[in-house]
């Protein structure tokens, strides 16, 4: 896990997106909810992970080199375990969720900022996970591309043309 570079240059995805990649990541989904406190999403995500045979995840913060939490999804539900992030005030740092095989990754600078899921779709399990996720939870590259010249788009209002271009330059 140490070979993953975690630098969040700016807190807003629209300025410069978080860089935490291993170069194998080739599909991306963006989200605007708290990765550690959106219990409705976490409940859903826990089920999708298990259905796609992901049985463990590690949770990192930007202040520690080792995981602050390792969750065996067969034995523990993600929600009560991830609440420890709030109990121990880790939500003041960046959050990264990643499986031991590094086939996908989710990162968010602060819980109020936009975050990104990254997938290595050459990995069959990761491709299956990407396909299984309900895209209504996320903003896709396609949606960003459509919003680039549409000033009435909520994404254009959120990021502006320069912000969307920065995201597309880093992720498309």
For the regions a protein language model found, what residue spans apply to each?
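Structured alpha/beta or helical-core interaction and ligand-binding surfaces enriched in interleaved
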Residues: 1-172
